[in-house]
Amino acid sequence: MKNSDIIVLDFGSQYTQLIARRLREQGVYTEILPFNAKISQIKEKNPKGLILSGGPASVYAKDAYFPNDEIFNLNLPILGICYGMQLIAYHFGASVTPTNKKEYGKSNLKFVSENALLKDTKDGQIVWMSHSDKVENLPDGFKTIAVSENSPFCAFCDEKRKIYALQFHPEVAHSECGDKILKNFAKYICDCESTWNMGNFAKIKCEEIKKQVGKDRVLCAVSGGVDSSVVAALLAHCIKENLIVVFVDNGLLRTDEAKQVEQTFKLKLGVELISIDASELFLGRLKGITDPEEKRKIIGKTFIEVFEREAKKHQNVKYLAQGTLYTDIIESSVVGSSKTIKSHHNVGGLPKDMKFKLIEPLKEIFKDEVRKLGTELGLSPDLVYRHPFPGPGLAIRILGEITPEKLCVLRKADVILRDELKSSGWYNKTWQAFCVLLNVNSVGVMGDNRTYENAVCIRVVDASDGMTASFSRLPYDLLENISRRIINEVDGINRVVYDISSKPPATIEWE
């Protein structure tokens, strides 16, 4: 991939990925590295600027996170945000202490002096704070450029060395002029150009794939979802003669999904599709398994075995292509001070001894960028904007052991949910919608009889890239219709609940 324009060093903030997304939206290619990335790793990317993210630690604490001091000797512009701001102050000799006046939420930013970072933004603008420490004094060579009610050094800089620091979070939507501030840093302080777009990405990625693959053949695993469909379309665009597209029915799909996948690829994409029914194999291996991580790893391992068996039927198949996204990489790895959230079946769930080399064309981009790429490649809107569906399928939407009976119940409930959302016009307004079969029975009354049956949870969320999400504020009448239909039409369910958790702290999927 191309060199990074901006590198974000991640100190564990829940907003780190937003920084990269906001800059990419402005055409500036941005990557995230761990806070303790080696200097050689940073130099290899040849960035034009660095951003130090926020984080949960305190710079004066024993467990504080510090980057390699050499980052300050690279002669690159640096922007510190929240923890990153305090780290800059601390590194250059200022005092950072706990504050009695913590700032969480909205605050007003008052300008003190003119500067390139805040140029053409509004004095008195609303900014988003989230800190319990304060900078007591400025290091030598720095000047205050803005204050807030409780932060006398809310923004400061050393313009000569192009080091800037903000106590607030410009990357979050609540910061009124945040996008403009990040743009000022990237374009006017770092001299980045707006060259990042999906058209350029497709051209660069095609050249990389052609060079990597040569005369070998590629097995492309598809599920019918957005990610794998875009991968298949991209590969068909550049190595169609060497491409084998395989769809595996693992028995964990939604109602009629296998038929829809076949129609999508043959009729809409014009790609020959090999369909394999491996449902008995998958369900047999998942029998008795209740741990979600074990489910994911069994599914990942079994997928690879099926693909390897299929590859033996064809000559020269050396590569496996799949729709791994940047979000999958982030959630499946330790980034900065963050912990692994969960293994994705196509990241942490893959066996180490598999015989394929991997091709993951989308692993550097976010979900919203995948949709733009799909549009660039000519895919239809109904395919590009369909809701995400996880690789492990319904296995991670059934808590506890997976059985054919539970799958049947969940499929029926899921059909009703999607039907009601589409008929009411809400389906395309939401990011993702699905049912979760809880491993919980509850007492109910139907007619004059006591029931003791399954509870189903409805999960509907709004998001732009899947890194963060909030629950959808569906109308009560719609929720009532969904609940009534599921209870009346699906045997074995007597209770429906609605998940009102956001991400974070919850993930979108339950497992």
Swiss-Prot record:
The enzyme's E.C. designation: 6.3.5.2
GO cellular component labels: cytosol
Disulfide bridge partners, by residue number: none
Pathway assignment: Purine metabolism; GMP biosynthesis; GMP from XMP (L-Gln route): step 1/1
Top-level taxon of the source organism: Bacteria
Glutamine amidotransferase type-1 domain residues: 5-195
Binding site for ATP: S223, G224, G225, V226, D227, S228, S229
GMPS ATP-PPase domain boundaries: 196-386
Keyword Protease included in the entry's annotation: no
SUPFAM superfamilies (UniProt xref): Adenine nucleotide alpha hydrolases-like, Class I glutamine amidotransferase-like, GMP synthetase C-terminal dimerisation domain
UniProt keyword terms in alphabetical order: ATP-binding, Glutamine amidotransferase, GMP biosynthesis, Ligase, Nucleotide-binding, Purine biosynthesis
Active site as annotated: C82 (nucleophile), H169, E171
A Pfam family reported for this protein in Swiss-Prot or TrEMBL: GATase
TM spans (from-to): none
Record-level Gene Ontology MF annotations: ATP binding; GMP synthase activity
InterPro entries (UniProt xref): Class_I_gatase-like, GATASE, GMP_synth_C, GMP_synth_GATase, GMP_synthase, GMPS_ATP_PPase_dom, NAD/GMP_synthase, Rossmann-like_a/b/a_fold
Record field: catalytic activity: XMP + L-glutamine + ATP + H2O = GMP + L-glutamate + AMP + diphosphate + 2 H(+)
Keyword field contains Lipid metabolism: no
Subunit details: Homodimer.
Function statement: Catalyzes the synthesis of GMP from XMP.
Protein name: GMP synthase [glutamine-hydrolyzing]
Higher taxonomy: Bacteria, Pseudomonadati, Campylobacterota, Epsilonproteobacteria, Campylobacterales
